[in-house]
């Protein structure tokens, strides 16, 4: 087990700067080349990392500036996967996402040109002299599985190449393990698995809408646990692996509701990660009680500061809530963060860059008061 001894943290995505948004629009319109876009990405990532360090963050990311989505870009980077469109996107509260998806077109495998590996290599190249930990966030294996069976067309595509789900789950786990080990070989010591599957499966209405049929929660939970843990077998001891369990974060809206209780006995008690990043920024998130299932010694990062709204939480309220959480998990194994990233997709949440950094400052300053 590898630990992070800093009690303030981030989830990882940041609002895309205007220059980057314009470059992506120009690339989509075929006004600039892929190399031109990459130059803008490189420069904006350099600026972001400098801001992260100046803010006092000890764990930094590239803001996911090269991605359109928090999850699909990673999926498209695996061998055997193609970029497709569905009739609908994901249904959020009062809003629907774009309708991109990922579909099987062959056996799934990791390849050495995966975009997340290339992204990390660049991040490392600009931070070699810095006293910070570099994090690479990737969507979880369970999230990949959920996308590949989302809707009848995706399911039909899977069946062309996989005769049973065991084989599919095994290939997903192996592709992910290969990606994680490649990141490690490139110098990464902090990998975070972003995972909406657990946050969605607690909400009967959401998942039934997405799959257009009923579902067996217990069966899904077993599959999610199996495919995630399958990717985490025999990893290096000095690699910290965490997971962020989300209920959806798109343009300041949410997708699912419900506390972590129904999934705690699986994900908290049995998933082989070092830390859990959990959303607790509103009443939809439920109580702290389920975190008692997290084994002693593992970290729980409390997402008490919302990334969806610009209004700043009161430090005293945050301190009170951390103390409440400490009734269920040791205070020294707790930390504070925003509830999610600021831009899980390139659209971003509805706040300004200045407001984003004020949120980060609030997290850091409050954590320093609690864990002085």
Q: What is the meaning of each model-derived region?
A:
Residues 1-372:
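Domain-level signal for soluble alpha/beta catalytic cores
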